Amino acid sequence: MRRSLAPSQVAKRKQGPDSDDEEDWEPDMEPQCKRDCREKYISPYRKPLTPLTNRPFCADGNEHEAFIRKILSKPFKIPIPNYTGVLGLRALGLRRAGVRKALHDPFEDGALVLYEPPVISAHDLIKADKEKLPVHVVVDPVLSKVLRPHQREGVKFLWDCVTGRRIENSYGCIMADEMGLGKTLQCITLIWTLLKQSPDCKPEIDKVIVVSPSSLVRNWYNEVGKWLGGRVQPVAIDGGSKDEIDSKLVNFISQQGMRIPTPILIISYETFRLHAEVLHKGKVGLVICDEGHRLKNSDNQTYLALNSMNAQRRVLISGTPIQNDLLEYFSLVHFVNSGILGTAQEFKKRFEIPILKGRDADASDKDRAAGEQKLQELISIVNRCLIRRTSDILSKYLPVKIEQVVCCNLTPLQKELYKLFLKQAKPVESLQTGKISVSSLSSITSLKKLCNHPALIYEKCLTGEEGFDGALDLFPQNYSTKAVEPQLSGKMLVLDYILAMTRTTTSDKVVLVSNYTQTLDLFEKLCRNRRYLYVRLDGTMSIKKRAKIVERFNNPSSPEFIFMLSSKAGGCGLNLIGANRLVMFDPDWNPANDEQAMARVWRDGQKKTCYIYRLLSTGTIEEKILQRQAHKKALSSCVVDEEQDVERHFSLGELRELFSLNEKTLSDTHDRFRCRRCVNGRQVRPPPDDSDCTCDLSNWHHCADKRGLRDPVLQASWDAAVSFVFHQRSHEDQRGVV
């Protein structure tokens, strides 16, 4: 086209000084002579040019108005064949047009569909309101692609529970998977799904609070970042001034809308309890309580603060829901789904008393039958809101774990001190009806420390405390606690051998766990004496520093050989896969605490065969603690794992023998089994083929000498002070390495 005929040039000429504003402008009006001259040179085959505007001649305003409306009523069409658009993207405030769709494709390979709308016939579809039809709820493919089969099942169970589809008018559940099965990832998947979608094409919830022990706040923050990247920004709080924390909590709880900027709050139990008033002022879509067995006491302040939250949906994570008794188990179930087991008094009368009566070793056949009936009734109710998978699932993904309970003889000094204490303190007199009274707790602590090393009770000997009067005469001359002397403790002697053999014959790293920081002090002295590089984590270490030293220790190139861990401070949730050997130096009354600590190395990412050593002093209170653990573990197993034939070998009345010393045994625990697989202390028949580390100790291998051991390191350490060993492996080794 000639430039002079362009609309912009024509308009300029029209607005010139000679133009008449009142005269209608017709862009197609051109002198006839110019048009005839130009058309001489146009090919007869060329299509005629169309006018610059298709505006028809409008005789009146009505026709013009109708024409404009017709133009504006035509929707814009993207010139791509079969283009339907991405309905999942935000529409910048405009209402979306078109049929409601799921956020993700439910028919894609590997899609995890949590909800499938009911099928509607074509006839009903015509009459249905298209704006109210439910859609599929599909887990984000970024997450569903990394979920293992048991985790996909777990996410589906969690979603069904918190949306009220399993129990009417109940929106809570307990995730009771054992350690290492990915409970955190399953909960993050649930959170992300609820925040983004629902059958009604909108988010199910707007805000989530994750409450965890302070040592795991940073871990949760990192896990959210790991799996969700930058798509969500969580707020993590575990420290700071009161005003600063209150300000952050007010900002969080006051957020409103379909998609708020910071929808996830991660907070420690202690901080939540202190600032609960702020969080009680708003509504929260979901509350997740990690290590939820902290809520076993329904009367403590943390439980009351959390239970007062305006949050229907509640998920409690606990690998060990039963720790001490069934009433604590009731508290956990009552927290997530209030009322399904009645009141505490009703639960005790209806379930707890008959079940415990039937589980006692002295129970009659009638009591056993009644207890079993009540147990099945309880299981049928609770299983609707509790999911539990045991760690045997991990055998598909993790290397073999060899767990060993090592009984160590007391040294002559320990025996003399032990007998002196029992003679002077007379702790048996403080026991009543097989239950541990408050007055006997100090005696228990003294005996446990003596089993670890005489150095731990040396101060009491100096001051002549009850039970240790005249004990100084038993110590070697010129004895000093400044230097550790392994030869004075049977367990310390065995530990010294284990560390030396591990250091010289393998490339493995070791985690040392104890309930007492004083014992960790002894470990430090031993490491300095043997020139082992080590790191230590206890309650004095800040959360930020904990994360740094764990990351450094897990680095294969780091020189640290030993990681010392206080089970009270860091036994839960830590990932220490840089080591593959773990020593539990002293037992805890609660089997859950020991299991949590022992699960630090046998976790996702571990590549080497794991060896767990549980050291006990032979014939002492430590073996009684192990026996009490067996009772608690059997109780947990029969209620949560639903095992039918969990053996109970110990009557509650036998706890009266707690304060005694059996000097003539290789293992007091093995003696109580009345084991039929062993003859004269030697195993003649192996345990059942399907037995593993989760079984009762009676179904483990029993070794009165080192010939039956599978661990070369423990074999080499036997002659130090070992009297008896129970050992079992997690699963059959698929790679030929044991």
From Swiss-Prot:
Reactions the enzyme catalyzes: ATP + H2O = ADP + phosphate + H(+)
Amino acids binding ATP: D177, E178, M179, G180, L181, G182, K183, T184
SUPFAM superfamilies reported for this sequence: P-loop containing nucleoside triphosphate hydrolases
Domain named Helicase ATP-binding: residues: 164-339
One Pfam family per UniProt: SNF2-rel_dom
CDD domains in the record: DEXHc_RAD54A, SF2_C_SNF
Signal peptide: none
Gene Ontology biological process terms from the UniProt entry: double-strand break repair via synthesis-dependent strand annealing; reciprocal meiotic recombination
Keyword Nucleotide-binding: yes
UniProt keyword annotations, A-Z: ATP-binding, Helicase, Hydrolase, Nucleotide-binding, Phosphoprotein
Keyword presence, Phosphoprotein: yes
Sequence ranges assigned to domain Helicase C-terminal in this UniProt record: 493-647
Major enzyme class: hydrolase
InterPro entries registered for this protein in UniProt: Helicase_ATP-bd, Helicase_C-like, P-loop_NTPase, SNF2-like_sf, SNF2/RAD54-like_C, SNF2_N, SNF2_RAD54_helicase_repair
Database matches in PANTHER family: DNA EXCISION REPAIR PROTEIN ERCC-6-RELATED, SNF2/RAD54 FAMILY MEMBER
Reported function: Plays an essential role in homologous recombination (HR) which is a major pathway for repairing DNA double-strand breaks (DSBs), single-stranded DNA (ssDNA) gaps, and stalled or collapsed replication forks. Acts as a molecular motor during the homology search and guides RAD51 ssDNA along a donor dsDNA thereby changing the homology search from the diffusion-based mechanism to a motor-guided mechanism. Also plays an essential role in RAD51-mediated synaptic complex formation which consists of three strands encased in a protein filament formed once homology is recognized.
Protein name in the entry: DNA repair and recombination protein RAD54-like
